[in-house]
């Protein structure tokens, strides 16, 4: 629990149980942590995920063993697919009564024992069962590092009951340190992008959720203010630059995309896509995607962009570091005629569209796009809103 505090965690979401008796006691004793108990493990796991997204930091979910742990698996999958750094900590039977440790080919040693690590290995960045109490510091160091580094995602630590109650001397524990070489932005890549944007008649920035994960919103805003290049965004990147800015044209894609954003995308001749995996929901038929554009992708995940060839050039870099370097380059301001054309599309194909709002009012109905627009005007910038997936994916962007 102390290590979670050191990582900046303030809240732990949980459903207690006999498999985490000692962990729950440790949580209660750690005054810097606030425990939030939910009615169900799925609620705790999704709360931890939402917490991580809201704070752009670590979320923590604590659950017991067996079906208590499997109740959190759906949220782990969601965190894996949405790049959310959540630490899942599950309780477990005594070490020598677990199939994971003994390797005995039986289904279970008894009530509530299950090999959760095998279940979650394919949907986490790191999953481990602790075998020795003295390894806890190193395993926590590694898990926390991996959750927050590179393309973020969930990690899972399974703690047997007897090891939870083991006596250790924290100062004497072995710690883990990465030997990974920090990712560097290549000057040649930055220069090539600056030249491409400057030469283009119709340049466009395509921003994804990776902008937020990298903490790059401010440097992106600085760059756009300087270059006046129109911006479109994926539904996951709606807050990467901000839809209310004058150069923000709209969301793109078949789900949640705007007509203005898609028009800009299809007419651009140079696209710099940053922090997006260019999913098929966004590109549609890749042979018809942005047919006039030279596409450069900057992303933290190399593997994601090996699945299909959507980009002409891929740059492996952190979004914030890349934009900080690009901001210092002499990028020519975008062609004013092109910028005004994009702004014109945004104005003509506004969201919500006025004729639809009027027709809904005549039928005494509520237009969801209009509702979203008004709600956004009334809420504080840091307000939290709980909605279903359709509203968040289709209406809000």
What are these regions (language model features)?
Residues 92-137, 237-346:
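Glycine-rich, acidic loop regions that bind phosphate or pyrophosphate groups
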Residues 114, 142, 146-199:
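Conformationally flexible catalytic loops at phosphate/diphosphate-handling active centers
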Residues 14-15, 88-90, 158, 229-235, ...:
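Short internal beta-strands
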Residues 1-10, 50-56, 146-151, 189-204, ...:
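Glycine-rich phosphate/diphosphate-binding loops that line cofactor/substrate pockets in enzymes
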Residues 25-32, 100, 118-123, 167-178, ...:
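Gly-rich Lys/Arg/Thr-decorated short loops/hinges at beta-loop-alpha junctions or inter-strand turns
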Residues 1-8, 18, 23-30, 346-397:
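Active-site diphosphate/adenylate-binding microenvironment
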Residues 21-101, 260-262, 267-279, 394-397:
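Thiamine diphosphate
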Residues 17-19, 93-94, 159-165, 209-211, ...:
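Glycine-rich beta-alpha junction loops
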């Amino acid at each position: 629990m102390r290590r979670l505090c050191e990582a900046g965690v303030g809240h732990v979401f949980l459903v207690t149980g006999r498999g985490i008796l000692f962990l729950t006691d440790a949580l209660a004793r750690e005054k810097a942590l606030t425990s939030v108990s939910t009615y169900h493990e799925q609620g705790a796991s999704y709360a931890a995920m939402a917490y991580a997204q809201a704070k752009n930091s670590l979320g923590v979910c604590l659950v017991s063993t067996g079906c208590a742990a499997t109740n959190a698996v759906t949220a782990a999958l969601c965190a894996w697919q949405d790049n959310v750094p959540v630490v899942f900590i599950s309780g477990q039977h005594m070490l020598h009564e677990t199939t994971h440790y003994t390797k005995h080919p039986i289904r279970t040693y008894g009530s509530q024992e299950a090999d959760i690590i095998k279940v979650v290995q394919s949907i986490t960045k790191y999953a481990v069962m602790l075998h020795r109490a003295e390894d806890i510091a190193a395993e926590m160091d590694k898990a926390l590092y991996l959750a927050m580094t590179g393309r973020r995602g969930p990690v899972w630590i399974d703690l047997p009951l007897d090891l939870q109650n083991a006596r250790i001397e924290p100062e004497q524990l072995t710690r883990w340190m990465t030997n990974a070489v920090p990712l560097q932005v290549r000057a040649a890549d930055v220069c090539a992008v600056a030249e491409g944007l400057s030469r283009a008649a119709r340049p466009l920035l395509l921003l994804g959720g990776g902008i937020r994960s990298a903490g790059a919103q401010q440097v992106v805003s600085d760059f756009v203010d300087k270059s006046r290049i129109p911006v479109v965004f994926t539904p996951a990147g709606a807050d990467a630059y901000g839809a209310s800015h004058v150069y923000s044209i709209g969301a793109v894609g078949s789900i949640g995309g705007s007509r203005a954003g898609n028009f800009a995308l299809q007419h651009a001749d140079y696209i710099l896509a940053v922090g997006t995996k260019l999913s098929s929901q966004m590109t549609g038929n890749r042979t018809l995607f942005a047919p006039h554009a030279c596409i450069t992708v900057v992303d933290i995940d190399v593997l994601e962009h090996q699945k299909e060839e959507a980009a002409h050039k891929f740059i492996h870099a952190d979004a914030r570091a890349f934009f900080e370097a690009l901001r210092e380059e002499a990028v020519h301001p975008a062609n004013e005629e092109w910028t005004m054309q994009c702004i014109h599309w945004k104005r003509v194909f506004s969201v919500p569209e006025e004729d639809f709002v009027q027709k809904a009012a005549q039928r005494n109905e509520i237009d969801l796009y209009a509702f979203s627009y008004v709600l956004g005007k009334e809420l504080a910038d840091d307000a939290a809103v709980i909605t279903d997936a359709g509203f968040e994916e289709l209406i809000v962007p």
